[in-house]
A protein has these predicted regions:
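NAD(P)+-binding Rossmann beta1-loop-alpha1 motif at the extreme N-terminus of oxidoreductases
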Residues: 2-59, 64-65
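A short helix->loop->beta-strand "cap" motif at the edges of active sites that frequently abuts
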Residues: 31-32, 90-94, 116-118
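Structural detector of well-ordered beta-strand residues that form the stable sheet scaffold
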Residues: 35, 96-97, 121
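Short beta->alpha hinge that forms the Motif I/post-I loop of the SAM-binding pocket
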Residues: 39-40, 74, 99
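Conserved short alpha-helix immediately C-terminal to the canonical SAM/SAH-binding motif I
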Residues: 42-43, 78, 103-106
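Rossmann-like NAD(P)-binding element
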Residues: 60-95
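Short glycine-rich anion-binding loops that position phosphate/pyrophosphate groups of nucleotides
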Residues: 75-79, 101-102, 126
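Rossmann-fold dinucleotide-binding core
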Residues: 110-134
Length: 134
């Protein structure tokens, strides 16, 4: 078990990588509030059934509000819109990262929405199988 690093973590996109992160947080960081955001009701229902998150929502801004760490784990094509929606609610000192496979588009699409006081750390975890979803 690791030391609790974050009070609230928002996972925007809860497919293969997002749900893997939720599982690790649930196992290793008890007491961290995990917020899962997805477009599809059936995805959020699976998250709730598997107890991967404490809070579920369809709204990226609702997920990101008050989070210490925000992880974007959606298709790259959604980044600009997600950035536009979450930018105004990111709290001072929050860390914003992603799991996208390329960085030029990530930086281009998210940087305009990251204000001073928010730490933007583009990321790329290596994980996966031929399956998707939680």
């Amino acid at each position: 078990m690791m030391e609790k690093l974050f009070d609230r973590v928002a996972l925007i996109g809860i497919g293969l990588i997002g749900s893997s992160l939720a599982r690790v947080l649930r196992r290793d960081s008890p007491g961290t509030t995990i917020v899962a955001c997805a477009r599809r009701a059936e995805t959020l229902a699976a998250v709730e059934r598997l107890e991967l998150a404490d809070v579920t929502t369809h709204d990226p801004a609702e997920a990101a509000a008050g989070a210490d760490l925000v992880v974007i784990a959606t298709p790259l094509s959604a980044y600009a819109e997600i950035g536009r929606r979450i930018g105004p609610v990111l709290k001072d000192g929050a860390i914003l990262t992603d799991v996208g496979s390329v960085k030029e588009a990530v930086i281009r699409d998210l940087t305009p929405h990251v204000r001073p006081g928010v730490h933007f750390v583009p990321g790329h975890p290596v994980a996966g199988t031929e399956h998707s979803g939680p």
